[in-house]
A protein has these predicted regions:
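Short amphipathic alpha-helix adjacent to the substrate-entry channel of hydrolases
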Residues: 43-66, 73-75
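N-terminal cap/lid segment of alpha/beta-hydrolase-fold proteins
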Residues: 1-25
Length: 292
């Protein structure tokens, strides 16, 4: 248990290939945040395990998969999730998830000596709702959000990996006070669960990977954007198994060696889906919650 919030005991699982007592040099760490539209999901889902084990055994990372509070679960169950309420509920939900991510990060950093972890090499990684959470965490650090007081003094992630994520802001645009940690973005441009570009809604916005990558490029901030034309929300999980070489390259060069590269890779499949260029708030709600 890394934190208790109300009636929720938030737990984490640690995956490592070498006991801390046998480690000569401190290992990098990956904190993973699961997906599930902020209404479902588990930190120990079987679909994630091969990726965790690969990162631990082949790449030498200690992987820490965390719980976080699912802020849309109760509003959905109570029938309070609608196009009218969503622009207020989503930012509150993401804020709560980032608070839990920061608490977990602080907990892990505090265990760094015991676990043989280098606190300067902690990478945040997430899928879907978890990807939104880690990107939001990086955005808050870059903008010195008051919530960052939960982190160790001067802390920043060594890198961030987002499998089909976005940043949520109560504004029509994202504004970065400074460049964030190196960011890797995977996204399909036919995703109907998380916008590939941007969705603006009642004074708030959900800014997807394409939008973020363009801003990072303008700032000359290191990033790796892996875009798949015609791919849907499968990019929330597929890269963990099928795009490991790209992930390894990002972690080695842009995170480990601090190579100031800005990489754009685009793939296209013969069975591509059409882009949803008119992504709306109704699209988001229908795709994520209609059958839940």
């Amino acid at each position: 248990v890394y934190s208790v919030k109300g009636g929720d005991s938030l737990r984490l699982d640690r995956y490592t290939d070498t006991p801390a007592a046998e480690i000569d040099a401190k290992k990098p760490c990956m904190i993973f945040v699961f997906g599930g539209a902020f209404i479902s999901g588990t930190r120990d889902a079987e679909s994630y395990r091969p990726f965790f084990e690969y990162m631990a055994r082949e790449q030498g990372y200690t992987v820490v998969s965390i719980d976080y509070r699912l802020g849309l679960k109760e509003p959905l169950a109570a029938g309070k999730l609608s196009p009218e309420t969503f622009p207020q509920l989503l930012p509150q939900t993401v804020l709560m998830a980032v608070e839990d991510l920061y608490d977990a990060t602080s907990f892990v950093a505090g265990k760094s000596a015991e676990w043989g972890i280098d606190p300067a090499r902690i990478v945040a990684c997430g899928s879907s709702a978890g990807a939104i959470t880690v990107l939001q965490g990086a955005y808050f650090i870059a903008n010195e959000n008051p919530l960052t007081a939960k982190l160790p003094d001067g802390f920043d992630y060594a890198g961030v990996i987002s499998f089909a994520g976005a940043v949520v802001d109560m504004a029509d645009d994202l504004t970065w006070k400074r460049a964030p940690a190196p960011i890797m973005l995977f996204h399909g441009d036919a995703d109907s669960n998380v916008p590939y570009r941007a969705l603006r809604m009642g004074g708030a916005g959900i800014f997807g990977s394409d939008y973020i990558a363009r801003q990072l490029s303008d700032m000359k901030s290191p990033y790796y954007f892996y875009s798949v034309e015609g791919a849907d929300h499968a990019l929330a999980t597929v890269p963990m198994n099928n795009y490991r070489d790209a992930i390894d390259q990002f972690l080695t060069q842009q995170v480990g060696e601090r190579l100031p590269a800005m990489i754009d890779t685009k793939e296209r499949y013969s069975n591509s889906l059409p882009q949803d260029k008119d992504f709306t708030i109704e699209t988001y709600i229908q795709s994520n919650f209609a059958t839940k």
